[in-house]
Amino acid sequence: MQPQDLDLNYGLLEDILKAFLQNEIRKFGFSSVVLGLSGGIDSAVVAELAVRALGPEHVLALKMPYKESSRESLEHADLMIRRLNIKAEERPVTPMADDFFRDVPEGERLRRGNIMARTRMVLLYDVSARDGSLVAGTSNKTELLLGYGTMFGDMASAVNPLGDLYKTQVRGLARHLGIPSILIDKAPSADLWEGQSDESDLGFSYGEVDLLLYMMLELRMEREAILGEGVSASFYDRVRKMVVRNQYKRLMPVIAKISGRTPGIDFRYARDWQEVR
Amino acid sequence: MQPQDLDLNYGLLEDILKAFLQNEIRKFGFSSVVLGLSGGIDSAVVAELAVRALGPEHVLALKMPYKESSRESLEHADLMIRRLNIKAEERPVTPMADDFFRDVPEGERLRRGNIMARTRMVLLYDVSARDGSLVAGTSNKTELLLGYGTMFGDMASAVNPLGDLYKTQVRGLARHLGIPSILIDKAPSADLWEGQSDESDLGFSYGEVDLLLYMMLELRMEREAILGEGVSASFYDRVRKMVVRNQYKRLMPVIAKISGRTPGIDFRYARDWQEVR
């Protein structure tokens, strides 16, 4: 298995994702999206797709730095804003985050990271209510499967064009879209503290884990067959456990079933239920 | 149709919900819950159930007042805390909420209400991470169906024992559990601003709408049959539209389907996937 095995027809993919954004946004009478533009590749790709799908006047980028956010991230976000000629607002999260942090010791990085991600969600959703727009999500499939994200934080959105694309495929799409290579080639980071990098956090590269997840999910290969491809047993077991343990992040809250029709269990209409039009 | 038609065997219901809490919490190695105790009937019932299911030492109540929260709400929350002999913490949301409110005009009550609900979610989830506990939800079925709640705010939880109970049934259960009648009989309020009441907000009573929802969902009665029960056409149409329009609040974010196995669409294991034990 090679990373190239995950490659997609990126021209066709661009068309599908543009149609997805147009359809899922306009069917409810909306015409615009707002997204958090972090300076990373995922949000850059979503911004690019949204502009191509809806037009630059219908895309608002929120820059939501914390006082410790890297200068580089903001510069890369500005690079995309100029490239796409879209409106942008800078809404620092420092005041709110620091209020929350008063009760959170400095070393509690995961708790602080979750608080920042959720503070950003509060801002994004308030701006979407202010403007009558929808929040575009930027979580990719690798993050969603590993649970490498914050519930009700960066994982919260109305429409997410990247949720079924491994990071490797987001990179391929980014190259196809002509996203500046400086954003594609730098080490991915959620920028939650200085020098933070996803891959050092996780202890493996996106390239490695994407191949493993692809073999597990898409190819449905058994453990022995995957180990036969040169994947170590410890890596396999660790990733499998991450996927299983984080299933709750991919589901609605558990509701105690009492009646014959329980929201989310057997009262499950599609989002665009027939009466809405 | 009479409100009594919605009545349940509340003794059996208590047993079912206690078993639900025990099972859904302990199966993942947790033993405790944290919940927002507002002084209202829903959170009082969840606190009571949690104590009976897990023991008072495993229930933490967070009181999260805003500077405009009613004194009465806090007193009623304290009433329950004494009754149940549980630990409690007061974490005012005023500093964080006011930071967010700087960009939100005074009159924008819905936006401010959503910000407060999400600020409380951030606190609840941080405390659950701090203590290694799960967040117990307090949204009832009437709220979930009408969309009368905040996504990623009060609707966010790990386990929700009330999600399949109409408000009428929560009241019945509250009486069975012996919840102080002062909490049962007062006008339900999310306490988002002074004098706020759900029923004046909604323009109808919980009793009326529960009967209508029950006929629509559980009894699957057609429009004409329901109007034949004395429900006005305008009330029927308005409630039906609320239920349909808020379906998105009961679903995970929409993900563009690209692969053969898309998180949430056809990669749908139960929350307690077999490997977790």
Swiss-Prot record, chains A, B:
Q: What keywords tag this UniProt record?
A: ATP-binding, Ligase, Magnesium, Metal-binding, NAD, Nucleotide-binding
Name the UniProt record assigns to this protein: NH(3)-dependent NAD(+) synthetase
Q: Which PANTHER family does this chain map to?
A: GLUTAMINE-DEPENDENT NAD(+) SYNTHETASE (PTHR23090:SF9), NH 3 /GLUTAMINE-DEPENDENT NAD + SYNTHETASE (PTHR23090)
Kindly list the positions annotated as binding Mg(2+). Answer: 42, 143
> Mind listing the GO biological process terms from this record?
NAD biosynthetic process
Q: What is its EC number?
A: 6.3.1.5
* Assembly behavior: Homodimer.
Q: Which GO terms describe its molecular function?
A: ATP binding; glutaminase activity; metal ion binding; NAD+ synthase (glutamine-hydrolyzing) activity; NAD+ synthase activity
Residues at which ATP binds: 36-43, 138, 167, 189
Instruction: Kindly report, in one word, the top-level EC class recorded for this enzyme.
Output: ligase
Tell whether Magnesium is among the UniProt keywords. yes
